[in-house]
Amino acid sequence: MRKFWRTAVAAAAVLTVATAAQAGDPDACKSVRLSDIGWTDITSTTAMTATLLKGLGYAPKIDQLSEEVTYTSMKKGDTDVFLGDWEPSMTSVRKPYVDEGSVVVLPDANLPQGAKYTLAVPQYTWDKGLKDFADIAKFKDSLQGKIYGIEPGNDGNGLILGLIKDNKDGLKDFQLVESSEQGMLAQVDRATRRNDDIVFLGWAPHPMNVKYKMQYLTGGDDSFGPDFGAAKVYTNERKDWASQCPNAAKLIANMKFSVDMENTWMDKILNGGEDPAKVATDWLKANPGALDTFLAGVTTVDGQPGEDAVKKSLGI
């Protein structure tokens, strides 16, 4: 009986090892295509994810796409993963694709708390009395009738255009200035150097909250949402990708971030001029304990221990 028991235990151990070795993903899953819409927070989280994928033997490919193109690309099967679904502001953009089933939203936010997204002003403009959306029109002359947004097609820009179109708070004669995140911040730099009034899209996490003395406007609940556009950021995947590539999908589901993490990464990218991939690598080397969470239940693409492989790729 004892001999039988030892044999059974040994067989179970062999089966466990064999099962682990057989994990991983099919060869077709080796290429993982991610969208980066050009916001520094999404650039940083996408770079972190790609660094881990690479360490696991995958071949991540990051494409610079707009929001709309991201969703049409997922629908066509050309993009697998998008880490930048800011909610509730992006609901109208993603909704048609989610409703038809071509895009899947992971149930748990990758940034569950601390995010916000609404209009903001420099502290000195706020001190003059521009504290609410309803105050913007009163400052039309000093604002030169302009509100500064980011890239064309962005959801925040769309909300501003809606305010202008509907003459919400008397904004019908205002102009939305569209450019990019960096372009908008250049305008904020210029205005703050001169103490000129300016209204712009602000959000957290982002180094702008440290670099500038700024305030978020009240009164935007109907457009940007309550609590100064309080937001959560979700991960989206193309239909069936998780079932086709379950190991890579497990990593993606594990990718959860904090405001402090993202602020650190973005500061190095925006203010330090560092490459996002280098920022990710350096941070992981300095914080190897994060691998326990990111890589829980994840193997390499060919089924070997995931954490060992990533540590080797990082040189730790």
Feature annotation, model-predicted:
Residues S102-P152:
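A conserved helix-loop-strand patch within extracytoplasmic ligand-binding domains
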Residues T49-L56, K140-F174, K285:
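Ligand-binding cleft/hinge of the Venus flytrap
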Residues M1-A23:
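Gram-negative bacterial Sec-dependent N-terminal signal peptides
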Residues K116-D127, A230-Q244, D267-K268:
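A bilobed periplasmic-binding-protein/Venus flytrap-type ligand-binding module shared by bacterial periplasmic
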Residues K30, T40-D41, G162-R193, V199, ...:
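An extracytoplasmic/periplasmic, membrane-proximal ligand-sensing/linker region
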Residues T72, T79-G84, P152-D221:
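Ligand-binding pocket segment of bilobal, Venus flytrap-like solute-binding proteins
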Residues P26-D41, Y58-D63, Q144-Y148, I252:
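Short, well-ordered beta-strand elements
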Residues Q22-R33, K54, A137-Q144, F294, ...:
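Immediate post-signal peptide segment of exported/extracytoplasmic ligand-binding proteins
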